[in-house]
């Protein structure tokens, strides 16, 4: 194939339409060197600014020499190159994580929004077969994604439709360790695939076909279930067990860096069915929050070391606090003004709940913890609820409950009003 054919494919797919700067992961192998040649030659046509990034894994004697040659190559092409050296105990997983962490650092430093890798169809076959042997979930058998958004960056794999044999023989570095069967991927490439191709010469095409078919099913299910609110458990549980599993898995597809194992997926299912309220860290910085008939999966938010100080409000004063306007003894106009009887004799304290808080109702003291459970108040709302306190006792839990003192006591003590208006809607 000609370089022009690859360029035409890139333009037709519109890989770089949304990107002005792209980082190329340059290993020095045939695939990445040819991708470098195409991208550097046709930067203007693709309308991108190319940046190179290389990781020296320090696993071979030749790696330092290769690093120097890549520096020369970048200088000749007048392109910036960033290089990092791997250290510590080597494994495929550690090396992969190190590479992607480094690439993200380079992107942040340069303002690039796309990471380009030279994965091709042969890599795709190996990946699908590896996952199948390891017993991965069905959705992961669709293989490597051609385009994948992770956070604020997009990973682009423009060679995924081409086999290695489609690339011309150009200057590159041969990694001799690829011939050794120490690593799983090498055993797949050097031993398992050749044996399977003896049974079916078109085995690679068959594997790619299965991957594409699974991807089609995933996309179709996502489209058909678009109007189903999976986070509403009443709605989710109205379907059969099989449909629930498929809908839940489709929902999890929204989080590309949350790759749950079968055991972790089963654990999530169990929590949704058995817990009324639960907060559970899952994986990769995500947590599951279950609140009665609703749940959500989100990134774990950093918690402040210290809670906000309580607010003290004096008579004949107003203050805006956490989305509300509080007016002590000064009437507010409007249809949605809350009014709470209070005393003018002392200041009002507005705060969040504390351990041991109680509210007097019908002459009985009730712990807030028990009150929240009885009223089925979600955990998030419990933590954000505003407590209005006077004379050392809770007068009201805003929007939830009020201290219902007897009429006689109210007439004696409650001689003014705290007016409250929601101002952050």
From Swiss-Prot:
Q: Name one GO cellular component term.
A: cytoplasm
Keyword Cytoplasm on entry: yes
Coiled coil ranges = none
EC class name: ligase
Recorded superkingdom: Bacteria
- Where, by residue number, does ATP bind? 27-32
Query: What is catalyzed by this enzyme?
Result: cytidine(34) in tRNA(Ile2) + L-lysine + ATP = lysidine(34) in tRNA(Ile2) + AMP + diphosphate + H(+)
Q: Which UniProt keywords apply?
A: ATP-binding, Cytoplasm, Ligase, Nucleotide-binding, tRNA processing
Family named by the database record:
Belongs to the tRNA(Ile)-lysidine synthase family.
Q: What is known of its domains?
A: The N-terminal region contains the highly conserved SGGXDS motif, predicted to be a P-loop motif involved in ATP binding.
The protein's name: tRNA(Ile)-lysidine synthase
The scientific name of the source species is Streptococcus pneumoniae (strain CGSP14)
Gene that this sequence comes from: tilS
């Amino acid at each position: 194939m000609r370089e022009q054919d690859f360029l035409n494919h890139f333009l037709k797919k519109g890989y770089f339409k949304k990107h002005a700067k792209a980082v190329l992961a340059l290993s020095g192998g045939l695939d990445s060197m040819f991708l470098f040649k195409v991208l550097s030659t046709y930067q203007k046509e693709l309308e991108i600014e190319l940046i190179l990034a290389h990781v020296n894994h320090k696993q071979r004697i030749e790696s330092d020499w290769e690093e120097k040659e890549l520096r020369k190559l970048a200088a000749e092409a007048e392109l910036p190159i960033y290089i990092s050296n791997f250290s510590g105990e080597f494994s495929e997983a550690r090396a992969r994580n190190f590479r992607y962490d480094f690439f993200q650092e380079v992107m942040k430093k340069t303002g690039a929004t796309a990471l380009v890798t030279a994965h091709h169809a042969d890599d795709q076959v190996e990946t699908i077969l590896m996952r199948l042997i390891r017993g991965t979930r069905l959705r992961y058998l669709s293989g490597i994604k051609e385009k994948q958004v992770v956070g604020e960056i997009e990973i682009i794999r423009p060679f995924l439709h081409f086999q290695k044999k489609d690339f011309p023989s150009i200057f590159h570095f041969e990694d001799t360790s690829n011939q050794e069967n120490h690593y799983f991927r090498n055993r797949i490439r050097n031993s398992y695939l050749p044996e399977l191709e003896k049974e079916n010469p078109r085995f690679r095409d068959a594997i790619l076909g299965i991957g594409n078919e699974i991807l089609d099913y995933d996309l179709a299910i996502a489209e058909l279930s678009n109007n189903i609110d999976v986070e509403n458990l009443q709605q989710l549980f109205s379907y059969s067990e099989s449909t629930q599993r498929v809908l839940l898995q489709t929902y999890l597809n929204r989080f590309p860096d949350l790759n749950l194992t079968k055991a972790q997926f089963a654990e999530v299912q169990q929590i949704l069915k058995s817990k009324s309220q639960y907060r559970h860290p899952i994986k990769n910085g995500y947590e599951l929050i279950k609140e009665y008939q609703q749940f959500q999966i989100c990134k774990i938010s950093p918690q402040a070391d210290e809670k906000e100080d309580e607010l003290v409000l004096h008579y004949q004063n107003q203050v805006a606090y956490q989305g509300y306007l509080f007016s002590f003894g000064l009437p507010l106009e409007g249809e949605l003004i809350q009014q709470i009887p209070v005393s003018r004799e002392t200041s009002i304290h507005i705060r969040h709940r504390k351990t041991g808080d109680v509210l007097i109702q019908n002459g009985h003291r009730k712990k807030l913890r028990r009150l929240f459970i009885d009223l089925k108040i979600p955990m998030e709302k419990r933590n954000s609820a505003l407590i209005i306190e006077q004379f050392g006792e809770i007068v009201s839990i805003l929007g939830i409950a009020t201290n219902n003192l007897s009429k006689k006591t109210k007439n004696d003590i409650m001689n003014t009003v705290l007016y409250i208006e929601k101002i952050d809607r």
